[in-house]
Amino acid sequence: MSQQTVHFVVMGVCGCGKTTAAQALQADFNSPYAEGDDFHTQANRDKMGAGIPLTDEDRYPWLRNLRDWMSEQSGKGERYSVVTCSALKRQYRDILREAEGEVVFIHLAPPHDVNLARMMARKGHYMKAEMLTSQEAILEELGADEAGVRIDNAGEPAEVEAEMLAWVKAQGFGG
């Protein structure tokens, strides 16, 4: 009997380190990886680039596309997949949980000042630092009934990755 796919969704506000952490997890598990930003429509990217926060209606097609990608990985028999997605609200996470398989959230949560400094240092990303406050305002923490962990990642990427991988393996995932 085959095991169901476990989808790790590395989540959090813009600039929190999702991509770096997800790539470390993907490398450790040698699993398929999807950068959530790649699933946004050009209209969404333009809107965010102009400093205009996305509405729920803007996000729903994006979330459904990510969910469908996750289900495709299950259909291929993958043991694990890794996805980056802000997943700011529970209702957004509910859409992702509709994917075939088990969905586990890894919420990266640096302090505001650390996150802002990281965003200011980024070059060439469509998401501007001004968007951080709007995302923080709507962020809903993981509920006690949601599979996942919150990592306060104020440290260096290697420290955050080590904490994340230790938690994932402590849950019984991985080799």
Each model region followed by its residue ranges:
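Conserved phosphate-donor/acceptor-positioning beta-strand/loop module used by diverse small-molecule
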Residues: 99-119
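Walker A/P-loop
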Residues: 19
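P-loop (Walker A) phosphate-binding loop of NTP-binding proteins
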Residues: 13
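Conserved substrate/cofactor phosphate-moiety recognition/catalytic segment
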Residues: 23-68
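Hydrophobic anchor at the beta1->P-loop junction of P-loop NTPases
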Residues: 10
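ATP-binding Walker
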Residues: 16
